[in-house]
A protein has these predicted regions:
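Canonical AAA+ ATPase core
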Residues: 1-64, 69-79, 120-122
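N-proximal short alpha-helices
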Residues: 12, 59-60, 85, 109, ...
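Hydrophobic aliphatic residues
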Residues: 21, 43-47, 94, 140, ...
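An amphipathic alpha-helix signature
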Residues: 36, 40-44, 87, 91, ...
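Short, structured loop/turn "capping" segments at alpha-beta junctions
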Residues: 36-38, 50-55, 82-88, 97-103
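C-terminal engagement/docking regions of AAA+ P-loop ATPases
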Residues: 74-79, 88, 97-176
Length: 176
């Protein structure tokens, strides 16, 4: 499992990742700037000679091994069942990204798999043995948004990916 950061494309020296590389990330989560008090603590520590990178790296400790993570994934897969109506729901949501006029490049099958696995993990974290439509819906944007490319017209109109994601899952009938 790899965690990575991506600088905004607007920054000098940064370039957008190709679609095939973006598709390999499970989630895209946007993190905002720190609160004022947190930033002041950071500045105070830095002013006092503390190098934040060194402090952070020294304090990092693994919480689980790669083997344990693999076992946890297997356990989740065995404990959380996936009903056919949830499979259909996920497939229909992802397919909508491929057939929307605002989309230049839609999400592929890897996105469907990612949405299924993330939904399964959400159910397990909620101590349920089944996936709910709300599990799926809550993960649509973090799982799909970075895999979808807006059409130039949609970008010029100022359509936000979050609005597109909401529109897409609202078009799909929720299973009962």
């Amino acid at each position: 499992t790899v965690f990575a950061t991506q600088n905004p494309v607007e920054f000098e020296g940064t370039y957008p990742l190709p679609e095939a590389q973006r598709d390999r990330f499970l989630f895209k989560i946007t993190i905002d700037f720190p609160e004022a008090a947190d930033e002041e603590r950071m500045l105070s520590a830095y002013a006092g000679g503390e190098r934040l990178h060194d402090t952070i790296v020294k304090s990092l400790q693994p919480v689980i091994s790669a083997a344990e993570l693999g076992e946890a994934r297997k356990t989740v897969a065995s404990l959380v069942r996936v009903e056919p109506n949830i499979i259909r729901y996920i497939q229909e949501i992802v397919a909508r990204t491929r057939h929307d006029d605002a989309v230049q490049i839609g999400a592929g099958p890897r996105a469907s798999l990612a949405l299924l696995e993330a939904s399964r993990a959400m159910a397990a974290l909620s101590e349920r043995s089944f996936i709910t439509p709300d599990d799926v819906k809550s993960l649509v944007e973090p799982v799909l948004a970075h895999r979808v490319t807006l059409s130039p017209d949609a970008e010029m109109e100022g359509l936000a990916l979050s609005d597109l994601m909401a529109r897409i899952y609202e078009q799909v009938e929720v299973p009962r």
